[in-house]
Amino acid sequence: MTPFLRWGDALLKLELFRPRGSIADRVPTPSRVVELTGNQALSLARHGATFALRGAVTYEMHAALRMWGVAVVKRADPWTPDPSLFARTLGAELLEQLSEAPPLVVCPAADGAALLGALQALRQRWPRVRGVALIAADIELPDLPRSSDLPREIDRIRVGRADAARARARVGRELGLLASHAGAAAAAFAHGQGGVAIVSGPGEREFSLEAAA
């Protein structure tokens, strides 16, 4: 079970503390060659695995995948984990950890299956919990795509690269956490709105983004 960290009115679910730093650690490795985000590929990597990558993938992510013997191909079928996997894991943990209904659950759009699974579990007890997915307003970042295929009931909030960078710096300064840009943006949104933020993706994989800014 990953811990909560309170930040103002927000509760941060620290999925970046999982063994490979991502909420994708919670799902089994696909049995076929599929297309994944960089953090998904790092979580599901095994020796000899082959993946295609989608979205923004940093130098550090590529280097780690090479170190673990992962082969990267240009194209494969898109893949999204089953939300019910997250309902049974992430959602069950949230129900155990929360004593009252959160106003919302927010996470980057790349973790949309986790968001849907969490809502599936939480709404059995608290039907009015709002779901929020963050998408990129300008330059796509790891786990922060420009669009998503989530249901219309999920609110989409656009986050710019500069806003994500400020959120990352603030989370590091105030909480001592080295979070990803997308995870920090989710934390900052929940800090202003209340609710639960899913903070996934360790920040050490994204220093090259700051060097390129």
Regions of interest found by a model, annotated:
Residues M1-A213:
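PLP-dependent amino-acid enzyme catalytic core
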